[in-house]
Structure formats: C-alpha cells, structure tokens
Amino acid sequence: MAIKGLEQAIDNLSRVRKNAIPAASAMTINRVATTAINQSSSQVARETRVRRKLVKERSRLKRATVKNPQARIKVNRGDLPVIKLGNARVVLSRRRRRKKGQRSSLKGGGSVLVVGNRRIPGAFIQQLKNGRWHVMQRVAGKNRYPIDVVKIPMAVPLTTAFKQNIERIRRERLPKELGYALQHQLRMVIKR
C-alpha cells in the first residue's frame, strides 16, 4: 500500500533548512518588539501631547538574529526640551495692557511664548554657552542661576507605557506572529 505524495513530502521535509525555525523566531521577536515600540510611542504621545515622531525617535531597537534570538529596546527617558516641539513665537494677548508702573504677573503686557501647541507664560528664548538655543524660564526659589530650560518630563510616561505594552503584546501577539513566520518559512521551501 503506497501513500500518495509520500516522496514529495519526504523531499519537502529534507529541503527545510536547519535554521528555518530560528529564523522564524527571530522574525517574530523583531515584529513584536517593533509593535511594542509603536504602540508605546503612540500612548506616550497622547499622554504628553507631543508629536509621535519625537517620542518614537527616542527608542532604539537592536534586532534579534538567528544566532542571538533576543531583541533589545533602548529608550532615552530623559526630559524633552520644549524647543523641539516646533516653531517658537511670541503671541500678544488681547487683554488690556497694564499701565506704566503697575505690577503684573504677565510681564511685557501679556505676551506669551508659544512653542508648538504649548503656551509657556514667562518664558523666553536664549542661546546657551554650548551654542544651542533653548526655551528658558525663571525658577522661583533658586538663588544661583535662577533660570532653567523648560522641559517636558518623559521618564514616568515612557517607563509605564513600555512596561505595560511589552507584557501585553508578548502575551497577545507572540503566538500568532510565530505561526505566521513559520508558515512563511515553510512556504518558501515547500513544493505543492
């Protein structure tokens, strides 16, 4: 009793490369890591009201290979200087300007510095000693050098987003993606 297509099946099995499964797993790991970066960046961008591109370029992916099936995501969690948000411009408020000699919290007659989509009262632009331009603001309670660069804190949102999303995506997407990658590897070598 001969099984139909047995020779073809044996031929196909012998044609599957030894590194087909490691290649599929490396491909899967890279896909899952990329998805984690994308979703975490989107979440942080929504929370901090910063463009997704600015958040995404703070994370680097060292891709998994057949020999080393581990992907490493490195994230720059430092604060983001406000000057990176876009064009800075001074907007004059339409409120009644203060009279000469009157004290006001809005100095300069209510002009406010707007950078990207953020209004920063009491801020100004200055070139630092290192040649970079930054948005500066006076800091109360600081005796020496009472001005500081205006920054958006990114450490907490980035950490929480990446921790949540990496675990969730690993649970949900990894088995599915591994199945797709194995099918892809087999499809390349198997003849029907």
Which positions does each model-derived feature cover?
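Short, Lys/Arg-rich flexible segments
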Residues: 1-192
